[in-house]
């Protein structure tokens, strides 16, 4: 069997070593006589899996002791509702909109604000700029009394990334960040955030799991209408197991965390991600056949959208790429073109193979 280079934005490629270990343990996890999917979530075998996964994640991200790690269901999209339910507390929240996902989060919070007895403000948007850059400081309208400031630090569809949170003024308002498509791609200063959430299916593991890292002082403020299962405090008190969690997804996430540690930790992972993204961006910038329209200081290392000079060549490009073992390169339907998602599991050789194919395709069709 020959594996392809999978550039899917999510569910995305997983490290081959992780898949191999999961395959070896599918029928018998470490002598238990059954696989992880068959285990009771309250049995000692699975509780040890969860404990190790959390310990490894804490080590990778240097998570302080006053933060709780939650392994929840519903994906990042459920967090668009769960966050205001838990944090709005009858007050006001600020939202920054820099792409499709932060726009969706803002829309859901607006939808719920009235029922929660609060308000949601648009504190800055780059929609008129086509979501091709980050917000500038002078474009921000931040409320220092806001309950929280929500942002998406990597916009998967538009390929815009905030690598340095220091670009935002520190008003003392808790930062709430959707990091679904770049968490674990570089070291983080967790203490700068009140809450971080990330759908697993890009850089953590399979779909169906969302990881929430929340500062303890933000627990216990849920609206009275919040369903029990969506109350962060309740889930924290129950070790993410008020109900049956997505057990196999947590297991795979734990294997990914161990794999990241084996790569040398997040500093080494970041260096590899910079090398991969630089390789592709340098090629795009030198080409008059392909174009990336994101401002250079706003470009994502994980999701790189690009356009061909002639849209009529899109289908031949994708067909040729598939034949060359390069899959899932079609851009999101809302923006068109192509998109290469090069998460942690994508090796440098995969990006080199893509660049080689793109160079050959442009030579034949330019």
From Swiss-Prot:
Main location: cytoplasm
Subcellular location: Cytoplasm
Catalysed reaction equations from the record: O-phospho-L-serine + 2-oxoglutarate = 3-phosphooxypyruvate + L-glutamate; 4-(phosphooxy)-L-threonine + 2-oxoglutarate = (R)-3-hydroxy-2-oxo-4-phosphooxybutanoate + L-glutamate
GO cellular component, one term: cytoplasm
EC number of the protein: 2.6.1.52
GO MF assignments: O-phospho-L-serine:2-oxoglutarate aminotransferase activity; pyridoxal phosphate binding
Residues where N6-(pyridoxal phosphate)lysine is found: 202
InterPro entries associated with the record: Aminotrans_V_dom, Pser_aminoTfrase, PyrdxlP-dep_Trfase, PyrdxlP-dep_Trfase_major, PyrdxlP-dep_Trfase_small
Amino-acid biosynthesis listed as a keyword: yes
Enzyme class: transferase
Assembly with partners or alone: Homodimer.
Function as written in the Swiss-Prot or TrEMBL entry: Catalyzes the reversible conversion of 3-phosphohydroxypyruvate to phosphoserine and of 3-hydroxy-2-oxo-4-phosphonooxybutanoate to phosphohydroxythreonine.
Name listed for the protein in its UniProt record: Phosphoserine aminotransferase
